[in-house]
UniProtKB/Swiss-Prot annotation:
Protein name in UniProt: Ankyrin repeat domain-containing protein 31
ANK repeat residue numbers: 475-504, 508-537, 541-570, 1162-1191, 1195-1224, 1228-1257
Gene (name only): Ankrd31
Task of the protein: Required for DNA double-strand breaks (DSBs) formation during meiotic recombination. Regulates the spatial and temporal patterns of pre-DSB recombinosome assembly and recombination activity by acting as a scaffold that anchors REC114 and other factors to specific genomic locations, thereby regulating DSB formation. Plays a key role in recombination in the pseudoautosomal regions of sex chromosomes.
Lineage, top ranks: Eukaryota, Metazoa, Chordata, Craniata, Vertebrata
The organism of origin for this protein: Mus musculus (Mouse)
Location(s), subcellular: Nucleus; Chromosome
């Protein structure tokens, strides 16, 4: 026995449950009841162990029960004393004779019915069961003992007493105790764990009731109850306290390890039925049980005396109540929840134990309560992943089989967890039991349970140690994993907070995120993702959580994963991504939102190439579905034969499809009675998509099948129409198409039966199943040795069921529109049932029909390997239709075999054709079904199709020839897509209106329309049918093809594809087709190019006529015609392909080039007509034939006008590429952009704008394209390209009135500026036409060259008389007007560049802006040369006037100048006549930089006025903040003032104004860092050019003649009012008023040649300064004289007061930049930071906006604090630097804006230095060194150096270097 005990301990591989104690534990940890029974003095603890039963197991076999030990807290002395009080009672209970014990047990049982609280264990640590005695010798039944020699001695050590429930199983090592209500006999079950297997110790004790025993038992129970109630915490609390240290291995611990601990569930005593013992005398087992033991049969628990039972189980029979334990994991980690039941501790069993009970109960068919539980869901007591249930079940099967083989095994009656809960809470007996408890105990339990919930819900979880969280069970699942599995969000959050690894996978590879995703637990998934879970974690088979969420249709979880970065295109080992797993359009749409746009094209092509269901999903919400209960009426014979179910098994390498389907075959007799076929049950057979790699594991999708019901309803038969098609992971779309037939003549029908027509890979029948009475099983094997590449391929098969035919008379069709010269033959290697032939080869499809062909995208289109053919019966209103398509896969062998076929006949179909004497054809039409985006089902009444019928061969027991034909795909040959589309007659359109959801409309396919050419012939069967034919016989389909699309555009990576060059399909997205081409197809495409042009092209004129006629027919089509694709879109795609084809073979189009220039009565050429109609192919051909793209019709319209007005984008692009003028005008001044804008053709307008169209060009009505636009999108598009609103345009025009003569010559036209803005400059018409097609830069350069030529001619002209003088002046003014407009354009372009520079400084270092800046500088240089010559011209006429001494000639001869500036006349004072004239003797030499200037007079009034204007504008420039509309307007006002004075002075001032206006344009490139750019480009500015500009502006007033009228005082006052506050800043010398101006010695305007070359300012510091200089220099054009006395005002520093400077000023001047937290204000306590906004305002840390730093500091320091500007700007720092320093650095620049006194030349006597303007100091930079960013110091280091050098003088800084 001792050896046995040792063996038992060694065999156990499980740890002990908390609360149970091993033999080697310390003395204080031993079980207290064991010590209590043995009268030991050690400190006792009460242990209460409860379980469903004691099931003794074999050695090494885990116990199938969960033992949950409950350890009471050590209540030292109080608990020990209470246990001692029970000692005597316990000894009496155990040591008395068996009879007394039996009586006591009975009394105890009856007494404790009202107190079913706990199970009491009496374990003995030292004494094994073999040494324990439970009764006398008379209670022993030796017959049932395996070892009869073992005797239980009375005075041996006391064994543990176990009072078990009636449901306790009698195991090999267990003696079951059973009771009966009428005769309460107790069986004491004592496990003998150390005995050999199969041994059983059974003892029966006859009960003899005695009052003493009863009283002793009552005393025991009451004492025990008091003990329990007096404890400080409930048993549940004590159980939860030890859960953290619980070992998961103890869940499987055997009884041997528990040392005989046996449970006594008091609450279950009265709940059990009593088993009647057959032999009361010897207390033996009942006969039934003995028989079961001896024979090894399985005997269920006996449930007798249920009616008499007063147990709480009520009508539930034999009930074993399990405890309601809340969330106990496999490792016994407790997830605390409240146990509301007053009887919380019940029995609990494992799942597999219940499963065994169910199995045995079902075998024995026991009582109804047990039967009910067999159908219940197995309780998931132990938390397992749903993926691992099979693994657990397989482990349990081995264990179960070993247990069931034992004859001694009697399975217990166990109920499911759900049933037990229901039995407790729903039965009436539960209420009785509830009342039996004392209210105090119940309230105590509830109260403490709530406390436990709060305690464990917060504190316990937070205190969980990491070892507990990371503990993993046998499946590798940790606590977080199981919490996610059960959607315990709190526990998930707690585990993550305690440091759990959220990406820890189980042994099977699954993570907690996988489990939460597959369950759809949104909160759990969210917590896991917040905790750092990898959203793309790969589980088993590379499956991501997104796969699980999508497959289970958890939309919110899927969206959460996608938002967290889940990849919807990641493919698992099965080759499927999450998008493929989508089961409905909603999920698919959700996934598509998170797919990058660049991948959608490729993805769509892939999906559509293999998934016809995807196409159907796109239209399922657009078309109503037919009900599956539609019925078909059919006329046939009453006697019909039914084919028995046939089984089709398709064996593929990685996927098998087994179809069991009943094919109903009706045999119709000629003399048949009417038979109505009832409602059809339409079932779909679902098959999973074939994958390249074999699928493994639990994620494998099972192929599903559905049998079509075949029923008889009186004389009716239900016809099952099934639709087989490919699905993406259970994505199944059922298509139903049933049409009601009636009133069909009997003789027009012959029975056709269901025929499986398969494609490419040999999945097909060699013979049709017609009226077969036996079931045939066809095993069709596809090639096993080859696997397709990369992506899944689909299977396609078509079955036409029960289709009737009716001969319908075809209407005659004209054949003049069907040329027979150019035809294409489409042949398909279908297996022929007979001799196939084509009776007509001259039929072609018209172009309009071709435009509605759907192109097969991707690999399925031209690969000839992945096709889905739907042989569909399209019936008239009197015709039945059914369809059934299967899926098949193409193999490389089939591709190779197909390559041996004729490449010309790449489309073929197997139709047995016959020629009937009548013009009839069967009404059943075969429609090809292939993957595509769209469906084209067009009904053209006048163009009938030669329809391909479905050939049903081998009419059973009937004629060999039949009007029905069977389309037979080959089983070994490759099949190209069958391109046949139904062209219905006009009379049948109404009947098809209600069939919107029919497969014809609902399934996208490639449809080839055929036209009936001969009315005397049609397609019928020809020759007898053959039962099995494997040779491919092509059926030629003729179709007129306008262009050929290369196969490489539509095929993908299928090896061995035969190139197809005559494809007649059109895709809705040519880009996707191009993207999906493969190298293999490109290599094979080269072979197709060699084909003759005769096969590829057709007569273009005939095609055009056909297209036009079809378009007219299309407009008249019935509204019910279904065309999901847009007509115009198809036409565009078609035109695109035409153009591609025309590029390859333009001469083969057959266009007559001799009549290209021929015009119609409107003056339109062929190109005009083609462009107007949007005929891209014809436009392309005409362009290739060198048609004039700029040819104008009678109204001045060009082909581009026509195309733009019609919105034909492709034609517009073609014309522009051919050289069409984008800005060509008609006689009304309308350009193509006007037409596109008026027609709201957004795409056309965008194309025109991209090619240089001017959005501001006006017609004769002064309307721009923006004025013509009505659509907001069109307006936004035009504005984005620089279009200006009409109000702005009016302002601009009113300003230009000053510059342009009042009567503008008609020969002048506008020209286009560089920034797409019209300036309205008058250019000679011949020059305008010449420069229209040239770039803007070249256009202006050409204009300047033309001006130079005119200037040379003027200089050569001799002025002899007044007529020559007038002619001279007129030409000079003409040149001046052109130059003025060019200057205005230059200035506008300069301003735009300045704005762009402020936005992005880096953009000027490269790209278009850099080139634009260089072009602007080049044009400016040319303009300066022209201005210099213009000055010479003015000097010439001035010298002539001076020489003739006729001073007033100039004014009398030029009245137009006053007319031009008539708006300024009102400002002229009455003293205008008192003008001073300069004397010729006052001329002094003026030294100019160029050395070419002559001596000219200098009026002091003019000089004074010029100085005043300059000072005023400089002062105003300081306050300028940005380039805004107000700024531009103010500059225009200044310019108007200067122009007024200039034009009133004399005509010779024109060149001065030009020169002065050119100054700003010359300075602008400097502001934009043009020097650096020019240096890089190698074309730097010429210093002389800039110097000349300044010299001209300096000396603009020199050229005033003696008789020139000087400006009056009000004009100068207006200029001085620019900024009244700064009048005192003027530096001009003012002289007293006098009748005539005093002569002033001339001052030589000597400027250093290098001065301007040295004026390259820093970009950031001079961007705004350049604009101010622009205004300053432009003001020099004023020649007005000031007549009031003037005083010389000494030079003053014009630095603005610091208070006037704001942050916005500093931002505009580049001193500071907007940013976040860049301003700081430090106090003793903290540092406050603020952000600077672009508007100059501040944003504090609290988000509040402040106007300036002063208000910010007031808020920080308190509302009552007074903050001055000086304090704020001295304490607030910008990046560590005080703001006041930024202002102080700005002061020198501001001062330099005023005329400095540096570099003044030597002046004559009487001339003050302040009166001369010089180059500002900041423009004297000699060179700029550009360095790379790598050479720059870090910001903080550079800031330190900068502060150091700023604080030192210039000399000290130089010394420091």
């Amino acid at each position: 026995m001792e050896n046995g005990a040792e063996a038992s301990d060694c065999d156990s591989d499980e740890t002990v449950i908390e609360g149970s104690v091993t033999e080697n534990e310390p003395e204080d940890e031993e079980l207290p009841w064991r010590r209590l029974l043995l009268n030991q003095d050690t400190t006792c603890r009460s242990e209460f162990c409860f379980h469903s039963g004691v099931d003794g197991m074999q050695k090494g076999i885990h116990s199938p029960e969960i033992q949950l030990g409950l350890k009471l807290r050590k209540d030292s002395q109080e608990q020990n004393n209470k246990n001692k009080l029970l000692l005597a009672l316990s000894e009496d209970l155990v040591l008395q004779d068996p009879q007394d014990k039996t009586a006591q047990n009975q009394v105890l049982l009856q007494t404790t019915k009202e107190f079913p609280v706990f199970t009491v264990s009496f374990p003995h640590p030292e004494v094994s069961w073999s040494h324990q005695n439970t009764g006398g010798h008379e209670a022993e039944n030796c017959e049932n003992l395996p070892h009869s020699k073992k005797e239980l001695r009375e005075n041996s050590d006391s064994p543990e007493v176990s009072l078990l429930s009636g449901t306790s199983p009698v195991a090999p090592d267990l003696v079951a105790l059973k009771e009966r209500l009428t005769e309460p006999v107790k069986t004491l079950a004592v496990p003998n764990t150390l005995s050999e297997p199969g041994e059983e110790v059974t003892q029966t004790m006859t009960s003899k009731e005695t009052k003493d025993e009863e009283s002793s038992l009552e005393t025991f129970v009451s004492t025990l109850e008091k003990l329990l109630e007096s404890s400080e915490c409930t048993q549940e609390e004590r159980l939860l306290e030890v859960m953290d240290d619980f070992n998961p291995q103890e869940l499987f611990s055997t009884l041997s390890n528990s040392l005989g601990s046996v449970s006594v569930p008091l609450n279950a005593w009265a709940a059990q039925g009593r088993d009647e013992l057959e032999n009361k005398a010897d207390a033996a087992l009942p006969a039934k049980l003995l028989a079961a033991v001896n024979t090894g049969a399985d005997v269920g628990p006996s449930c007798q005396g249920q009616e008499k039972s007063s147990s709480v189980s009520g009508g539930n029979g034999c009930l074993a109540v399990q405890p309601i334990m809340s969330q106990v994991d496999e490792d016994c980690t407790q997830i605390a929840q409240n146990i509301e039941d007053p009887k919380p501790f019940r029995l609990q069993t494992l799942t597999h134990e219940n499963a065994i009970s169910y199995e045995q109960i079902n075998k024995k068919k026991n009582s109804d309560p047990i039967k009910n539980t067999s159908t219940q869901e197995t309780p998931r007591v132990l938390r397992r992943s749903s993926r691992l249930e099979k693994l657990k079940a397989s482990r349990d099967v081995v264990h179960t089989e070993a247990v069931l083989k034992k004859p001694e095994r009697i399975l217990s009656n166990t109920l499911s967890f759900k049933d037990q809960i229901n039995s407790i809470f729903t039965t009436d007996s539960f209420s009785k039991r509830k009342n039996m408890h004392s209210s105090g105990f119940k309230n105590e339990q509830i109260r403490k349970s709530e406390q436990l919930r709060k305690k464990n819900g917060t504190g316990e979880m937070k205190k969980m140690c990491l070892c507990t969280i990371n503990r993993r069970n046998v499946f590798g699942e940790n606590l977080l994993y199981k919490a996610a599995l059960h959607n315990d969000v709190d526990l998930v959050r707690c585990c993550i907070k305690n440091g759990e690894n959220v990406n820890q996978p189980s042994y099977d590879g699954w993570t907690a995120l996988h489990e939460a995703s597959i369950g759809g637990y949104y909160q759990a998934v969210s917590e896991l993702l917040k905790g750092g879970a990898d959203v793309n974690v790969k589980g088993k088979y590379q499956i991501t959580p997104l796969h699980d969420a999508v497959m289970n249709r958890h939309y919110k979880v899927a969206e959460l994963l996608l938002m967290s970065g889940a990849d919807p295109l990641f493919r698992s080992d099965h080759g499927t991504c999450a998008l493929d797993e989508a089961k409905d359009s909603s999920m698919e749409t959700l996934l598509m939102k998170y797919i990058p746009q660049q991948k959608k094209c490729h993805l769509s092509a892939q999906r559509n190439s293999t998934d016809p269901a995807h196409v159907e999903d796109m239209f399922q919400n657009k078309k109503p579905k037919l009900s599956s209960n539609n019925y078909t009426e059919f006329i046939c014979d009453e006697n019909f034969d039914r084919q028995e179910p046939g089984h089709l098994e398709i064996n593929k390498g990685s996927n098998n499809l087994l179809m069991s389907k009943e094919y109903v075959c009706e045999h119709c007799q000629k003399d048949s009675n009417t038979t109505k076929f009832g409602k059809s049950n339409l079932n779909s057979v679902k098959n999973s998509r074939t994958n390249v790699s074999k699928r493994k594991g639990q994620k494998n999708r099972q192929q599903k099948k559905t049998q079509v019901d075949d029923r008889d309803c009186n004389l009716s038969q239900k016809i099952g129409t099934s639709s087989f098609r490919r699905t993406n992971k259970l994505l199944t779309q059922q298509q139903h198409a049933v049409q009601t037939l009636s009133d069909l003549p009997e003789e027009s029908f012959e029975l056709s039966t269901t025929t499986l027509s398969s494609l490419e890979n040999g999945i097909g029948y060699n013979e049709a199943c017609l009226v077969s009475k036996k079931s045939d099983t066809h095993v069709l094997d596809s090639s096993d040795g080859q696997e397709l590449e990369s992506v899944d391929q689909t299977e396609a098969a078509s079955v036409s069921e029960l289709s009737s035919y009716k001969e319908i008379k075809l209407l005659p069709v004209t054949t003049h529109q069907q040329p027979h010269t150019n035809q294409e033959q489409y042949s398909s290697p279908y297996k022929s049932l007979g001799n196939n032939s084509s009776n007509e080869k001259g039929k072609a499809t018209n172009k309009w029909e071709d435009s509605f062909f759907s192109f097969i995208k991707g690999r399925s289109a031209d690969s000839d390997s992945d096709c889905h053919t739907l042989d569909k019966s399209i019936a008239s209103p009197k015709e039945g239709m059914s369809h059934d398509h299967h899926e098949e896969i193409m193999t490389g062998q089939e591709v190779d075999s197909q390559q041996r076929l004729s490449s010309e006949n790449y489309f073929s179909q197997e139709n047995d054709l016959k020629v009937h004497p009548l013009t009839t054809h069967p009404q059943e039409e075969a429609v090809n079904f292939c993957d595509s985006n769209l469906i084209s089902v067009q009904h053209t009444p006048d163009y009938k199709n030669c329809l391909h019928e479905i050939s049903f061969g081998n009419s059973y027991a009937k004629t060999e020839q039949s009007s029905t034909s069977c389309t037979r795909p080959p089983s070994t040959q490759k099949v190209s897509p069958l391109t046949v589309e139904v062209e219905l007659l006009k009379g049948l359109q109404d009947s098809l209106a209600h069939r919107d959801s029919s497969p014809l409309v609902n399934q996208a396919g490639i449809h080839s329309l055929e036209r009936k050419q001969d009315t005397d012939k049609n397609y019928t069967k020809k020759g007898p049918n053959t039962s099995s034919s494997s040779r491919p016989l092509p059926t030629v389909v003729h179709s007129q093809v306008i262009e050929i699309t290369k196969a490489e555009k539509r095929r993908e990576d299928l090896p061995g594809n035969e190139p197809i060059n005559n494809t007649d399909f059109y895709s809705t997205d040519i880009n996707k087709e191009l993207a999906n081409s493969s190298q293999l197809n490109q290599r094979k495409e080269k072979e197709n190019v060699r084909k003759s042009d005769a096969e590829l092209t057709h007569n273009d004129s005939e095609a055009e006529r056909t297209l036009k006629s079809c378009e007219e027919k299309k407009k008249n089509m019935d509204s019910e015609t279904h065309s999901p694709c847009d007509i115009q879109e198809h036409r565009k795609d078609q035109n695109f392909r035409k153009r591609k084809c025309s590029l390859k073979a333009p001469c083969s189009q057959g266009v007559n080039t001799t009549g290209i220039g021929k015009r119609n009565k409107k003056g339109e050429s062929q190109l005009h007509v083609a462009a107007r109609g949007g005929n891209l192919s014809r436009v392309k051909v005409l362009i290739e034939a060198r048609a004039d793209v700029n040819l104008r019709d009678n109204a001045g319209w060009t082909p581009l006008h026509k195309a733009a007005s019609g919105g034909f984008d492709d034609v517009i692009i073609e014309l522009l590429q051919a050289g069409a003028n984008v800005n060509c005008e008609n006689i009304d001044g309308i350009v193509p952009l006007h037409g596109a804008s008026a027609g709201n053709h957004l795409k056309a307008a965008e194309i025109l704008l991209e090619h240089g169209a001017n959005p501001n060009q006006k017609d004769q009505k002064q309307r721009t394209a923006l004025d013509e636009a009505d659509d907001e999108k069109m307006k936004e598009l035009l504005k984005s390209y620089g279009a200006i609103e009409s109000t702005n345009g009016e302002k601009r025009n009113s300003t230009d009135l000053v510059k342009i003569p009042t009567v503008q010559p008609k020969r002048y036209k506008q020209f286009i500026c560089d920034n797409d803005k019209a300036i309205g400059s008058p250019v000679p018409s011949h020059k305008a036409k010449k420069s229209e097609s040239l770039p803007v830069h070249q256009t202006i350069s050409a204009i300047l060259q033309d001006i130079e030529e005119k200037q040379e001619n003027l200089l050569k002209l001799e002025i002899r008389n007044s007529e020559d003088e007038e002619q001279y002046i007129g030409k000079m003014l003409e040149i001046k007007e052109v130059m003025d407009n060019i200057l205005a354009q230059q200035k506008t372009e300069r301003d735009d560049l300045a704005k762009k520079y402020r936005v992005s400084m880096e953009s000027f270092k490269h790209g278009a802006l850099r080139e634009q800046l260089a072009n602007l500088a080049t044009r400016q240089k040319s303009l300066l040369v022209v201005a210099k010559k213009q000055k010479k011209i003015r000097l010439k006429i001035q010298n002539y006037k001076n020489a003739t001494a006729v001073s007033g000639v100039g004014l009398r001869k030029l009245p137009c100048n006053s007319d031009i500036s008539s708006d300024k006349k009102s400002q002229e004072p009455p003293t205008m006549g008192d003008s001073a004239h300069a004397q010729p003797g006052l001329l002094a030499p003026v030294s100019l930089a160029y050395g070419s200037m002559q001596e000219i007079p200098l009026s002091p009034e003019i000089e004074s006025e010029s100085q005043k204007i300059n000072i005023c504008l400089n002062a105003e420039a300081i306050r300028r903040e940005e380039f805004s509309g107000n700024d531009i307007n103010s500059k225009q006002n200044v310019q108007d003032c200067t122009l007024g004075g200039l034009l009133r002075s004399k005509p010779t001032d024109d060149a001065e104004k030009i020169a002065s206006s050119s100054q700003p344009a010359a300075l602008t490139p400097h502001a934009e860092n043009s020097q650096a750019e020019a240096t890089v480009k190698g074309c730097g500015f010429d210093s002389s050019a800039l110097t000349g500009t300044i010299n001209i502006s300096e000396d603009k007033s020199i050229f005033s003649p003696n008789g020139a009228c000087l400006a009056a005082d009000p004009h100068s006052q207006k200029l001085s009012r620019c900024n009244p506050k700064r009048r005192n800043k003027k530096t001009a010398s003012q002289q007293p008023s006098a009748g005539a101006a005093e002569p002033l010695p001339q001052a030589p305007a000597v400027l250093d040649t290098y001065t301007v070359h040295q004026t390259l300012p820093c970009l950031r510091d001079s961007a705004a300064a350049a604009s101010h200089t622009d205004s300053t220099q432009s003001s020099l054009s004023s020649a007005s004289a000031h007549q009031h006395p003037t005083k010389t005002v000494p030079h003053r520093n014009t630095t603005p007061r610091k208070k006037a400077v704001q942050l916005k000023d500093l931002i505009l001047r580049g001193r500071i930049n907007p940013g976040n937290n860049i301003l700081e204000f430090k106090t003793q306590e903290t540092t406050h930071r603020a952000s600077v906004l672009p508007s100059g305002k501040l944003k504090g840390e609290n988000g509040q906006i402040y106007q300036n730093p002063v208000t910010w500091l007031k808020e920080l320091l308190g509302g009552g604090s007074y903050v001055t500007w000086n304090y704020a700007w001295n304490t607030v720092t910008y990046l560590g630097r005080e703001l006041v320093k930024c202002v102080s650095e700005e002061a020198p620049m501001s001062a330099e804006l005023n005329p400095p006194q540096l570099h003044q030349p030597h002046l004559s006597a009487g001339t003050s230095r302040e009166s001369m303007q010089t180059i500002p100091h900041y423009l004297q930079i000699k060179e700029i060194l550009q360095i790379s960013k790598q050479e720059l110091l870090p910001c903080h280091v550079m800031e330190q150096h900068w502060k150091f050098y700023v604080g030192r003088s210039h000399s000290e800084a130089l010394l420091s270097w």
